[in-house]
């Protein structure tokens, strides 16, 4: 599990390999990830946009951005938690993702909340140190 805390907004990520959707013989590797966003602050915030920086093991970078998450722009009141799941396909057996959410506070202030970097590793992947 991976965690980041920005201005009392906690983001927790739990990635998992989706073997049934992956096809290594066709260079298709798919991961799901579960995200929990917890508002530990004293003000309400709305998740407005997302930004992802995805890098595969060959260094190929894909950047993804857009409004909300899974079609929603959730409002998190103080003490609220919001959970969602999504996925990421890669052409390589491993990679890494990180990013941020743009949040809008109830007073109109906007700020970014970090999504922690997390690894996408296929089961049985052997790593060697040089």
From Swiss-Prot:
It holds the Pfam family DUF525. Residues 3-127 form the ApaG domain. One of its GO terms (biological process) is error-free translesion synthesis. It comes from the Bacteria. InterPro entries: ApaG_domain (IPR007474), ApaG_sf (IPR036767), Uncharacterised_ApaG (IPR023065). HAMAP family: ApaG (MF_00791). PANTHER family: F-BOX ONLY PROTEIN 3 (PTHR14289), POLYMERASE DELTA-INTERACTING PROTEIN 2 (PTHR14289:SF16). This is Protein ApaG. The lineage of its organism: Bacteria, Pseudomonadati, Pseudomonadota, Alphaproteobacteria, Hyphomicrobiales.
């Amino acid at each position: 599990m991976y965690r980041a805390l920005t201005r009392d907004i906690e983001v927790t990520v739990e990635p998992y390999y989706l073997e049934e959707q992956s096809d290594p013989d066709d260079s298709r590797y798919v991961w799901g990830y579960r995200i929990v966003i917890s508002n530990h602050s004293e003000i309400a915030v709305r998740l407005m946009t997302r930004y992802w920086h995805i890098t595969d093991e060959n260094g190929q970078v894909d950047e993804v951005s857009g409004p909300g998450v899974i079609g929603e722009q959730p409002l998190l009141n103080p003490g609220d938690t919001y959970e969602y799941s999504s996925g990421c396909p890669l052409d390589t057996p491993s990679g890494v993702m990180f990013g941020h959410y743009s949040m809008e506070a109830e007073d109109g202030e906007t700020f970014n909340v970090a999504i922690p970097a997390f690894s996408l590793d296929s089961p049985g992947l052997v790593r060697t140190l040089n």
